[in-house]
A protein has these predicted regions:
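CheY-like receiver
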Residues: 109, 118-134
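Acidic, metal-coordinating helix/loop segments flanking the phosphotransfer/catalytic sites
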Residues: 19, 32-49
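Hydrophobic/aromatic residues positioned on beta-strands within the core alpha/beta folds
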Residues: 80-81
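Charged phosphotransfer/docking patches of two-component systems
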Residues: 12-16
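Conserved phosphotransfer microenvironments
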Residues: 52-70
Length: 134
């Protein structure tokens, strides 16, 4: 059964590229959101993973979006951002952060890891994924 992934990214070309990679890896896209309102409108318990940028069309709302997606919908959240330092020690309930740019092989490793974690499996995280311990 494919994993359903929500992409929260305000730069259209980056969002479309990530969505293409998601499809190429055999997963389903729950759509693209570019701000808090659209992300929460698309959110549901049917979504497994969210890839969330920090700085969006409505400002630096990514951390609040990620926290809400994790707490309210049980979605595994990975931040994909050019500036992971903005996340400090991490965001409650979320898994971690991946620094842009991200290529196909790295995104595949991260998604494989997140899917394994969601299933309760214990595997080592990819080297580029900075995990939050919260």
């Amino acid at each position: 059964m494919p994993t359903t992934i929500l992409i929260v990214e305000d730069e259209f070309l980056i969002a479309v590229e990530i969505e293409a990679v998601v499809h190429d890896l055999g997963h389903e896209s729950a759509g693209i959101a570019d701000d808090m309102e659209s992300a929460l409108a698309k959110a549901s318990e049917a979504i497994d993973v969210a890839l969330v940028d920090v700085n969006l069309a409505d400002g630096a709302t990514g951390p609040r979006i990620g926290e809400k997606l994790a707490a309210d919908f049980g979605i595994e959240v990975i931040f994909v951002t050019t500036n992971p330092a903005q996340l400090g020690e991490g965001v409650s309930g979320t898994l971690g952060a991946l620094e842009k740019p991200v290529d196909l092989s790295i995104l595949k490793q991260v998604l494989d890891y997140v899917i394994a974690v969601r299933k309760g499996e214990k595997i080592d995280p990819p080297a580029r994924l900075r995990l939050f311990f919260n």
